[in-house]
Design a protein with these regions (language model features):
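Active-site metal-coordination/substrate-binding segment of hydrolases
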Residues: 92-159, 453
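N-terminal helical capping/dimerization or prosegment-like subdomains
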Residues: 14-109, 333, 350
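N-terminal amphipathic/hydrophobic targeting modules at extreme N-termini
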Residues: 1-10
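Acidic/histidine-rich catalytic neighborhood of metal-dependent amide-processing enzymes
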Residues: 132-207, 469
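A short core secondary-structure module
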Residues: 231-253
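A generic structural motif
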Residues: 132, 222-224, 340-348, 377
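An extended, acidic, His-containing surface patch that forms the Zn2+-binding/catalytic region
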Residues: 198-199, 256-333, 344-357, 362, ...
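Acidic, glycine-rich active-site loops and adjacent beta-strand->loop/helix elements
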Residues: 101-103, 161-169, 192-196, 220-222, ...
Length: 469
């Protein structure tokens, strides 16, 4: 079921210059983005459902204002999906733009310099939850559509698929895609939800990692106990959970889960050579993160560890007393949330099962261990010999003045593999964020330079892609 919004005529601005139009209107572009960022569209929180609807409606409104001839909000059992399109000629190529308006929780709030949903501009950067992931990035495409429509230069048909559940695994997007294949018919999918190496060194992600995610619960006594009366006689769930987690890596930071690496498609020597040529300032990297040394799987560089290698990370661990001051208890339960980033040809379901089996097999006497599955997604690689990739590379070279370097992204976009399977479409990633933009962390940010440069670059992609015979 969907709710359709009436379209309105677009007043074409008498200007044939993309750059001139952008310069004239970029202050408004920014204000419209800030309005979007003020909406706390946190998909993981059920109490935020009204905000999700509000955000979807604003996205719909902006797409219509940008020149879309059709924009609809589709209801799902979860959060709404926004679809829009501008069809200029069915014979011309069609680009499907994917993005998401939902954001990660902002916790811990006390670590934000300014409130996460009260966006502020400091040092040429937008600080707000969702500034880069992904409101700031998908909104570049909305403004690029406006520029091309207003100047009468739109060279392709454009469709938009903007969802509200990416941060929780795109739970209902698969059903929508399967039920609306004709609606989503296109020639390529364009996504801006990834990063560049730096503002000085543009790059294009040629792949993203997959994801497996579980929650582990270790249960001991039927209540929290006095650590003096019972300590040493009763198994401590927190201590045992810590030991289990520590056993997941060996002394070389190699993951020890049986069969974990069985299906890993190793990167070619040629790809590793190209990655080695990408600039990397180790001192600046450590300074930005406030760490004294790098860490990771032995035998691989930082770029390789965060792109072509699978990982296992603890995302949260808790149990017992964690409030202010002290309380000497032996906790009844301990918990951990643990995720793995996956590389081709690992399968999310297989790795999830391996994680669950590993933790349950390690349950020592005195406690019980349960592990439950959360969302996941498959890894994805995109070809670099396609017309779409070359169009993206040419567009970035046009505006940045240098050729982009192909790299693999460390994050996950769970829906990518499904797009290719159900729609038969390849994906091109044109991300303009930076790894230092604090995605999923306090003080998320997005450089104004990147925001405006993205808006400037995207029309060139459409121009070059339209040259497809």
């Amino acid at each position: 079921m969907c709710r359709k919004s009436s379209t309105h005529p677009f007043n074409t601005y008498p200007m044939n210059s993309w750059k001139e139009y952008q310069t004239l209107h970029q202050e408004r572009f920014l204000e419209e983005l800030l309005e979007l960022l003020r909406i706390p569209s946190v998909s993981a929180r059920t109490e935020n459902k009204p905000h999700m609807q509000t955000c979807a409606e604003l996205v719909q409104k902006r797409l219509l204002e940008a020149g879309a001839s059709r924009a609809e909000i589709f209801s799902t059992p979860g959060h709404p999906i926004v679809f829009a399109e501008k069809i200029i000629d069915p014979a011309k190529p069609t680009v499907l733009v994917y993005g998401h308006y939902d954001v990660q929780p902002a916790d811990p709030l006390e670590l934000w310099t300014t409130p996460p949903f009260e966006p502020s501009i400091r040092d040429g950067k937008i600080f707000a939850r969702g500034a880069c992931d992904d409101k700031g990035q998908f909104f570049m495409h909305v403004k690029a559509l406006e520029i091309m429509t207003a100047t009468g230069t739109l060279p392709v048909n454009i469709k938009f698929l903007i969802e509200g559940e990416e941060e929780v695994g795109s739970s209902h997007l698969a059903d929508f895609v399967k039920s609306n294949k004709a609606l989503l018919q296109a020639d390529v999918i364009l996504i801006s939800d990834t990063s560049m190496l730096s503002m000085e060194t543009p790059s294009i992600d040629v792949g993203v990692r997959g994801l497996s995610y579980i929650e582990v619960e270790v249960t001991g006594p039927n209540r929290d106990l006095h650590s003096g009366v019972y300590g040493g006689a009763v198994a401590n769930p927190a201590t045992l959970l810590a030991k289990m987690i520590a056993s997941c890596h060996d002394e070389n930071n190699h993951i020890t889960l049986p069969g974990f690496y069985d299906d890993v498609l190793e990167a070619s020597a040629g790809e590793r050579t190209k990655m080695a040529g990408a600039p990397f300032d180790e001192a600046a990297y450590k300074k930005d993160l406030g760490i004294p040394a790098l860490w990771g799987e032995k035998g691989f560089t930082t770029h390789e560890r965060t792109g072509i290698r699978p990982t296992l990370e603890v995302n949260g661990i808790w149990g017992g007393y964690t409030g202010e001051g002290s309380k000497t208890v032996l906790p009844s339960k301990a918990f951990a949330k643990i995720s793995c980033r996956l590389v081709p040809n690992q399968k999310s379901a297989d790795i999830t099962k391996k994680m669950i089996d590993y933790f349950q097999s390690m349950a020592p006497a005195g406690v019980t261990v349960t592990a439950t599955e959360h969302h996941g997604g498959e890894p994805y690689l995109t070809p670099i010999d396609s017309h779409a990739y070359r169009s993206a590379a040419k567009a970035i070279a046009q505006t940045f003045g240098k050729e982009p370097i192909p790299v693999r992204g460390g994050g996950s976009i769970p829906i990518c593999a499904l797009f290719e399977k159900e729609l038969g479409l390849k994906i091109v990633f044109m991300g303009f964020g930076l790894d230092s933009d604090n995605l999923h962390s306090p003080n998320e940010k997005y450089d104004l330079f990147n925001f405006y440069k993205g808006i400037e670059t995207i029309p060139y992609f459409h121009l070059y892609f339209a040259e497809k015979s």
